[in-house]
Amino acid sequence: MNELIKHKLELLPDSPGCYLHKDKEGTIIYVGKAKNLKKRVRSYFRGSHDTKTELLVSEIVDFEYIVTESDTEALLLEINLIQKNMPKYNIKLKDDKSYPFLKITNESFPRLVITRYIKKNDGLYFGPYPDSYTANEVKKLLDRIFPFKKCKNPINKVCFYYHLGQCCAHTICHTDKAYWDRLIDDVKHFLNGKDDKIIEDLRSKMLAASEEMAFERAAEYRDLISGIATMRTKQRVMSKDLQDRDIFGYYVDKGWMCVQVFFVRQGKLIQRDVNLFPYYNDAEEDFLTYMGQFYQDKQHFIPKEVFIPEAIDEELVAAIVPTKIIKPKRGEKKQLVALATKNARVSLQQKFDLLEKDIKKTSGAIENLGQLLRIDKPVRIEAFDNSNIQGTSPVAAMVVFVDGKPSKKDYRKFKIKTVVGPDDYASMREVLFRRYSRVKKEGLQAPNLIIVDGGVGQVNVAKDVIEKQLGLTIPVAGLQKNDKHQTHDLLFGNPLEVVPLPRRSEEFFLLHRIQDEVHRFAVTFHRQVRRKNSFSSTLDHISGLGPKRKQLLLRHFKTITAIASATSEEIQALGIPKTVVEAIQQQITDNKNDRSSP
């Protein structure tokens, strides 16, 4: 704890509010809320914590706080601050967690479409469905049963679906709006689970077609009835009152939380959402934060009712979720919350079981690798790779694996400073010398094994730097790829030789992951540098365009091509004067003309 934090801790008020932890760069890494700011913030810097909280605390070099009038106000502010700053230690809902809905548009002649986003007053929504496949299957079934409008063509224009007998827009609907309204009502009833009348109508049509000897048409009606029956069986009835509701349950253990949400529509469980994440606050408070983010996400439909567990404050939930909040006390409804909670416990236990299994496998892999190479167990492995194109923008990267897992906070990037042209050996020599001379000088933690991406030449260069230039005794190995650019051989020893490594062994998979990761990290860094260099060279020597404005353009547009495609107004919106914008556009045009000239 530094002196600044010590001083600020003495000044904390006994009030509700939000606190924002910052790292050495001034970046907000965690946002929390508290009923009592003094007690909560001080708790981070006193006593012992679990590993993940210690990691958070180790990065805190400053904090701010905002006092609020109430705990409810603090909760709302916390949710907004998290969404604005996206701190790395806060709960993050998965980006791909939006579920598909079926939507009846509110056009004059409505259509049935699939969407993942809900817009207020933009139509009727049904769902969510577990995935796109299920939503499409339901829509295809509806398209065959109901001949409503399916395209955006003008109402008086014949479309493809009309010829298939799946659209009546050109005929009946064009003249009879009431018929159209009845058709949409039938679709609503179907999607709300009231499909008995529809099945009865289809069965009557099937029998009539059979009597007319129109067996193909009868078979189509039979298949439609079968499709509806199949869809029914995939939905478990959870409630007899046919109400739309979301049911929340959560479970905490070993510093982790699992939240389960059951989506119940028309009394049927149609999908569940599962999210697991580490929590640093009080469990109930982190659950409230999760709920706030869940519904503010705009991807989740807010039902008529939301069920919550007994331990959660109803008033706080009601402040962030605009619907009826129920804390069931007895009977079937309480059992539903208990079921969601039980599923959360099972999911969390499964995660721990998988983690334990993974730890055992990984621990075995690094132990076996050490035995194979006849070295101490390589708990810490540092791997290196170079990246350049014909010697331009040369860079290198280092990744670190601790206990067989990536330690991304220890990753390092290197711009090659002393090498001219495409010389991988010289580049590797420079990078290894820079890295391990610093390790030696500053007493940093040394790895148990160094891995270089390459063959005999790369390994010999690495050994020369480590052993002869720096006088260190760190084992060095090389990973060679085959013609398909896949991990193939492990080189080690004195003299170097190929180490026999079973292709299906855990240690081979570990080395394969390490090689892929260092290659990915190096190539990504090289692309960033190359793009920035290209960007800078094009925009050099433009009056009024200094480093800060160039950086602003790079962050916003990413590439010169994107700037060339942008309008003057879009560039000026970044705060760049019109005269400078005109100079930028002229420079890009001149460069393009120079390249196209013979």
Swiss-Prot record:
Assembly with partners or alone: Interacts with UvrB in an incision complex.
NCBIfam families of this UniProt entry? uvrC
Which top-level group of life is the source organism from? Bacteria
Q: What is this protein called?
A: UvrABC system protein C
Pfam families referenced in this protein's UniProt entry, alphabetically: GIY-YIG, HHH_5, UVR, UvrC_RNaseH, UvrC_RNaseH_dom
One MF term in GO for this entry? DNA binding
Q: Which InterPro entries match?
A: GIY-YIG_endonuc (IPR000305), GIY-YIG_endonuc_sf (IPR035901), GIY-YIG_UvrC_Cho (IPR047296), RuvA_2-like (IPR010994), UVR_dom (IPR001943), UVR_dom_sf (IPR036876), UvrABC_protein_C (IPR050066), UvrC (IPR004791)
UniProt-listed SMART domains: GIYc
Q: Which UniProt keywords apply?
A: Cytoplasm, DNA damage, DNA excision, DNA repair, Excision nuclease, SOS response
Q: What does this protein do?
A: The UvrABC repair system catalyzes the recognition and processing of DNA lesions. UvrC both incises the 5' and 3' sides of the lesion. The N-terminal half is responsible for the 3' incision and the C-terminal half is responsible for the 5' incision.
Where's the GIY-YIG domain?
Answer: 14-91
What gene name is listed for this protein?
A: uvrC
